[in-house]
Regions:
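Membrane-proximal transmembrane or re-entrant/amphipathic helices at the cytosolic face
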Residues: 2-5, 414-428, 441-501
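Interhelical loop/hinge segments that connect adjacent transmembrane helices in multipass membrane
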Residues: 2-9, 148, 191-232, 236, ...
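Transmembrane helical elements of multi-pass membrane transporters/channels
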Residues: 16-31, 178-181, 185, 189, ...
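Interfacial segments at transmembrane-helix termini and the short loops linking adjacent helices
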Residues: 105-124, 291, 308-338, 384-389, ...
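N-terminal membrane topogenesis motif
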Residues: 1-32, 65, 70, 78-88, ...
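Membrane-interface helix-loop junctions in multi-pass transport and translocation proteins
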Residues: 39-49, 54, 145-148, 159-191, ...
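Signature of the first transmembrane helix
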Residues: 9-66, 91-106, 122, 127, ...
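Helix-loop junctions and terminal segments of transmembrane helices
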Residues: 62-80, 142-143, 253, 257-301, ...
Length: 501
């Protein structure tokens, strides 16, 4: 049963991945480019202030969504009364969370030593109400693998919001340029989502439907709260302990690494959850799809993360001297991005096979470890200055995830998919072998050209040389990437560029 809101023709998994990639690549890259332009004009303190407001809103939105997105996607049987009940519960919850956010904004600014934060958070608080109107619609489009509509919506909103933010920054709006960019993006995304979505809520509420949905979503929600703790607690501790400048350096490096993951791995994971759910009763096909998904995710993320690490010093020098302390932080987060490229496929597999409770336990276990690590690290680096504080916290976040959490989730996913470590290693091997080629190629280009080019010129050449070296390794070792290159060349040959009109 497809359930309400599904499109008449379901897209294939491959087509869903393609449009999910278009959505996330465009959205993430546009958003990151906009932030980089604005950050170069404003500096780490303004960026850190908005980041702290965003962390607060992300926490609030956990209680808004309550794991219902995954529940709507995963359920085999879904009716209109389920959707109506979810919509009205979410909307009522949003109203209460909105009022609570307005009340707590002053306290949040005080504990983070950022006086401007209170006003920023209050102005950004309508995002809570906007998000409440998107949860069910977006889940239905994901459930039906309608990622083309989601891609158009996300990219259009990101471009319009980004343009407004950049114009405001050049006009001297300061920190409010970042705030305006986020608000405009959210409003445009909401309008387009309801334009594309076929479902509309009915004026009815079923308590039985709520109970039915929350039986599964509770475990998903607990897992998402744990994910928030492990992914956002570091920013909170940095803000409380060191202030917005350290937060700005830390979050900028994290944003770049996360952009790589969100743009190139998350689309595969988003398409994988409904695909894995449909293959619950076909172990052989589930194993094959799981390995293919891990290989695609790693093949996209790991080379890009290696490249970002290799040129991080050049990149941040271009933003300005006050950002140079973020270069070493990005190197550490490149390792985290590589680990997440594999882990991002383990979690949807466990959810699709009916094990959301397992992911919740694992996520909370890592969160508990992270709490201890962050508190200890923060107490040891108080006198090291913002760059040293940000770097130490980055190591404290990356090490437990890579050395503890990933091996456990991967082992469980392999068991549920009836796969093998060897199969996963074969899938990620081309990406791993591309890393030394990328790093050596990029740094060699920098060493040779340093006397002749400025930072921008060296950055462009280093990216080109490192990318070519890594691409050669991927194409040589991976049939999938070799086939992708062949298809791309065929498309170019069939549609050659024309000179003039």
């Amino acid at each position: 049963m497809t359930g309400p809101g599904a499109s008449p023709e379901h897209s294939s998994f491959g087509n869903a991945v393609k449009w999910s990639l278009v959505m996330n690549i465009g959205n993430q890259l546009t958003g990151t480019i906009v932030l980089l332009v604005i950050a170069a004009l404003l500096g780490p303190e303004a960026f850190g202030t908005v980041a702290l407001a965003t962390v607060f809103l992300l926490f609030v939105q956990l209680f808004l969504e309550q794991g219902l997105t995954t529940t709507i996607i995963q359920r085999k049987t879904l009716t209109d009364r389920h959707l109506d009940a979810a919509f009205w519960v979410i909307l009522a919850t949003a109203a209460m969370l909105f009022v609570g956010t307005l009340s707590l904004a002053g306290w949040w600014a005080e504990v983070n030593h950022a006086p401007n934060l209170a006003g920023v958070l209050r102005v950004m608080s309508p995002i809570i109400l906007i998000q409440a109107l998107t949860v069910v619609q977006q889940a239905l489009l994901q459930r039906s693998l309608s990622f083309k509509a989601l891609a158009i919506r996300a990219n259009t909103a990101s471009v319009i919001g980004g343009a407004v933010g950049i114009i405001a920054a050049f006009a001297g709006a300061g920190v409010w340029a970042l705030v305006l960019q986020q608000l405009v993006t959210q409003v445009i995304a909401l309008v387009l989502l309801w334009a594309f979505g076929m479902w509309r809520p009915g004026l009815r509420f079923s308590r039985a439907a709520v109970v039915d949905l929350y039986g599964f979503s509770r475990s998903v929600f607990l897992g998402k709260v744990g994910t928030f703790v492990q992914s956002q607690l570091d920013s909170i501790i940095i803000g409380v302990s060191f202030g917005p400048v350290a937060v700005g350096l830390y979050r900028m490096a994290l944003r770049i690494a996360r952009t790589i993951v969100d743009a190139f791995s998350q689309p595969v994971a988003m398409a994988a959850l409904p695909a894995f759910s449909r293959l619950q009763d076909d172990p052989a096909e589930l194993d094959r799809t799981f390995r293919d998904s891990v290989g695609r995710s790693a093949g996209l993320v790991i080379p890009l993360a290696a490249g970002a690490a290799a040129v991080s010093d050049l990149f941040f020098r271009l933003l300005g001297d006050e950002w140079s302390g973020a270069a070493a932080v990005l190197v550490v987060f490149a390792v985290l991005a590589a680990a997440r490229s594999v882990n991002n496929l383990c979690l949807p597999l466990l959810q699709a096979t009916g094990r959301p409770g397992v992911t919740a336990v694992l996520t909370w276990s890592l969160a508990a470890v992270n709490v201890g690590v962050f508190v200890v690290v923060a107490s040891l680096v108080g006198d090291r200055g913002a760059p040293g504080q940000a770097l130490a916290m980055a190591v404290g976040r990356t090490a437990p995830f890579t050395l503890i959490y990933l091996p456990i989730t991967l082992a469980l996913a392999i068991r549920m998919a009836e796969s093998s470590f060897r199969g996963i290693l074969v899938a990620v091997r081309p990406a791993l072998f591309s890393v030394p080629a990328i790093v050596v190629g990029a740094r060699a280009a920098v060493a040779v050209l340093d006397p002749y080019l400025d930072d921008l010129g060296m950055l462009l050449v280093a990216v080109a040389v490192g990318g070519l070296a890594g691409g050669c390794v991927l194409v040589t070792m991976s049939p999938f990437w070799r086939g992708a290159l062949t298809k791309a060349l065929l498309v170019i040959r069939r549609n050659p560029p024309t000179a003039g009109t």
